[in-house]
């Protein structure tokens, strides 16, 4: 890990004069690849002399102040470089000019262009295009502000890393201890840390006293890790003599030499990696882009065709250009941008009620199209609390209750051996409940002490009553705390039972070490010699519990004889003056971080929904595999290569990996794999567990899944997960246990840390995709009755049947609430029983949807509108045949004697009132046919009668659009404001037959689709 990596990422790349962008891009990619590699350092392998030579540090006096200042000037401060952030105004501009908005802007500009052409060439130009341009601009700006506000609630990634950086550090310089600002710590500094401190930089430990650090934010291991000067592992992340920047020292003290600072630390590399990753385009953004291409294509095709046609029909150039612009603008669905935004927002709110907080609106749908979930183990699939799972005493394994509400199995608590075992577990234990929690349930109480001891404390408190009282009865005299060399913990207590000797020695520790110190064993309360048979029984039990991925501890005791150890005897723990061999073995207790109750069911749902769940954890492979089996990630009956080898009793190398459906991959193996080998694993195994993985490997796994074409969701809670969260199509962070950093990198936060909430999210995401299709189908259909009047106006030269203002009243008025109401529609079938959609083939808007909306339903709607138009003009004396070619005279304000079919003469004002009445009636007809369209859009396959009319918002939408249409028609003053005139009641009914026709036509179509799945009708019309 060269000194320069990380830091030079932010310095401008050396680029030639021509500004060779390729070079810059290549350099950035190289840097990112460099960061993705495993941490490479050798400081943990060096002896103290070699360290002294490498860093020039006196191991007792530290650096001199002058030397420290030189290094500080060379390396810069010990701080993380903030990433280049996107300014707020650019984010706002993205909302204003991104995707769909661009289409509306082009429409608005074209409107202003058309208006300026008219203003320049006509004496009294009509203001329609001006109004339209203003309205389009307003729609984009309002919707843009709304989306920006929705997303501005989430903030930037790096600031949370800053909260993790320690403020002060204790260094030794010139032989004196001094507290300095952590930013001034330099490579080679001698640093001291104690329990409660944050580690100020990456340190090579040179001396330690009972030091333990919490690496969970970095490696995901929930247990505190011991730190000592010993070199214990080739991998720097696993060895005991390196402590990492910004992890916490939990207990003890240590002294170390700084080997890396700032961006060059392991944490700094992760920070740089997370901020340097480009998040790809969300699936829904890609869908909307595809949709815009289709709409633009249709608009331009129609516009250009009619432009050429109008020139053939001998219109002037200027008129033809205005027609061209009018047609393109008429194709733009003005209300759709707002509809999509509101639908996504509603779903986001609905998900928040179900404990999924969505930060990025488009991520709502991404979760629905997810095909692979890479889940962290600790805290997501498990409860993140060590719990006693099994005991072995009286030569049999007993199961403890690990459920969250203690509703599980229980065991025989009356055995004398169990009483002895629980006594050791309670006494030889330094964990205590924190104060004032008596009224809380035992499992919910906070404990001071390490995870395993807390588990024992809670278990004994549940089974045997107050541990505090037990400890008061058996007063502690002396203890030897646990350390890594002898691997046991021992204490001696006063024994209140007068029938027994007055001193009781209790010990717990690594099972094999404890057994070595015992010569007898307690069976059913009686002490018996420990023979080979019993030793084998112990070995089998130990292997079985260990194979379940559980952490096993052994327990033994000894009553110290009164004649050697009378009352008041001075026990000495340094120069041990009491027996620590020939003890009596009592039993084993094993602990595990148990799966959450709802997870197996959730994993099952994912499987039936076609989603592959992969476990990626920093934990031990055996534990990972046990939990994977417990939650169903590895299902019953599926074997790994190791299982097959064990069953057939052959070496692993002889098993064909393709025979195993499941596989457990160790991080160290992953390190040596090529991307092709990883691809093979992901392709040929359905159930995969990655164990002992590093943060960089998580990222490589996510990229591997994406290479397979999967849409990947990643869950995580540690800092170590942030690069993977950022790279995934959707990152899901934990709300309770998650570090700030992971929450910043994610798109979604699980407020209850429960994997099961993801499944709810998937369901909501799939539903919104279906419902957006319905919404778009509904909205697009009214485009045809809006465009055709304009086209017929050009071709047949008839008076304009529908005006611009009325089109806006439909798109931004009557159609809005019904379109949004479809977001509340319930799923037609079990959406969690089908495969995830394929983003390449299953589009939001496909040719079939366009053909249904434009070609079939839209055409029937247009017929309904024209029927009403011809009825009104005929009632006023203009028969349809008489209208052909009438446009030029009709629109000429200087001609006041246009004759109708019966010879009556009409002035310009009178003609226009009839024309605007037709506009109003055409508008009302569209509302009437949209009733049927709304009802048929409720379902894509089922009959409306199967689905029912339970959607109250949709029923409200039907009434709302009708009321709005009536208001616009009958409200006094509308004739002046919007040029809309009152209609005769009978004119409302002209479109009813067409509305009924749409309903019947679509019900028949869906019936055929249900009767003949995969047939011609489904292939051509099922969107």
UniProtKB/Swiss-Prot annotation:
* Signal peptide (residue range): none
Phosphoserine (modified residue): where?
Answer: 16, 40, 47, 228, 452, 484, 668, 675, 943
Give the N6-acetyllysine positions (modified residues): 9, 21
UniProt: ATP binding residues: 487
Resulting phenotype, residue 600 to A: In CMT2DD; shows fewer Na(+)-dependent currents than wild-type protein
Q: Which residues form the propeptide?
A: 1-5
Q: What keywords does the record list, in alphabetical order? A: Acetylation, ATP-binding, Cell membrane, Cell projection, Charcot-Marie-Tooth disease, Epilepsy, Intellectual disability, Ion transport, Magnesium, Membrane, Metal-binding, Neurodegeneration, Neuropathy, Nucleotide-binding, Phosphoprotein, Potassium, Potassium transport, Primary hypomagnesemia, Sodium, Sodium transport, Sodium/potassium transport, Translocase, Transmembrane, Transmembrane helix, Transport
**How would you describe this protein's topology in the membrane?**
Multi-pass membrane protein
The active site of this protein is located at: 376
Q: Where is this region: Mediates interaction with SCN7A?
A: 596-717
Enumerate the Cytoplasmic topological stretches: 6-87, 153-288, 339-772, 824-843, 939-951, 1007-1023
The consequence of residue 600 to T is: In CMT2DD; uncertain significance
Q: Which disease is it linked to?
A: Charcot-Marie-Tooth disease, axonal, type 2DD: A dominant axonal form of Charcot-Marie-Tooth disease, a disorder of the peripheral nervous system, characterized by progressive weakness and atrophy, initially of the peroneal muscles and later of the distal muscles of the arms. Charcot-Marie-Tooth disease is classified in two main groups on the basis of electrophysiologic properties and histopathology: primary peripheral demyelinating neuropathies (designated CMT1 when they are dominantly inherited) and primary peripheral axonal neuropathies (CMT2).
The protein depicted here goes by the name: Sodium/potassium-transporting ATPase subunit alpha-1
Question: What is the native source organism of this protein?
Answer: Homo sapiens (Human)
Lineage start = Eukaryota, Metazoa, Chordata, Craniata, Vertebrata
